[in-house]
Amino acid sequence: MSFNTIAQWFALNSDLLLTATWQTLYMVAIAGAVGFALGIPLGVILHTTKKEGLLENLPLNRALGAVVNIGRSVPFLVLMVAIIPVTKLIVGTFIGTTAAIVPLTIGAIPFVARLIESALLEVPTGLVEAAQSMGATPLQIIRKVLLPEALPTILNSVTITLVTLVSYSAMAGTVGGGGLGDVAIRYGFHRYDITIMAVTVVMLIVLVQIIQSIGDALVRRVDHR
């Protein structure tokens, strides 16, 4: 394939691919932001209400843990179909980029919660005990000890979540969710266009690599251990 042929192909398909890329970024950004806003506090609650936790409350911990486990165990495609009524209630439709954000967000929340819970478990108990001995309240310990000490792992969890959301957004495209996954299915698979299928796969890989590289750089910057 000559350079002119490649240039012509990209000229013909650039608008389609750029639009799909922005749709993917839009889905991942909104779902990630809401997922973190709800998942991080949920993870903190799971950690602090466990046995011998700062706010020990085993019934609450078990109830929330069960809900989180159920949320994590449902495959994303099944989740998308199962919550169609909820998606229609919130967005007004279950097809399209904005509609895909609803299941993406619901899928992200329990995922983030468990990652945050695991990140907080890495904080040495000695630091928490030292803060308690100085009279710090549970909220002060969470804000000034647990979260700052776990920040590198939390940032790594954010990176993992965003990468996962990219793959989920591609799956959303198989049922009309828009984005690069939608282009790969509609134009690559249904029209038997191997070139556009390959290009969308490469673009997804590049997007994941960019997210991972930025995440790794941020972790290195804040990790002073």
UniProtKB/Swiss-Prot annotation:
The chain crosses the membrane at residues 25-45, 62-84, 101-121, 160-180, 194-214. One of its GO terms (cellular component) is plasma membrane. Residues 21-212 form the ABC transmembrane type-1 domain. Its main location: membrane. The keyword Membrane applies. It is a multi-pass membrane protein. It comes from the Bacteria. Gene3D superfamilies: MetI-like. GO terms for biological process: D-methionine transmembrane transport. It is found in: Cell inner membrane. Part of the binding-protein-dependent transport system for D-methionine. Probably responsible for the translocation of the substrate across the membrane. This is Probable D-methionine transport system permease protein MetI. The lineage of its organism: Bacteria, Pseudomonadati, Pseudomonadota, Gammaproteobacteria, Vibrionales.
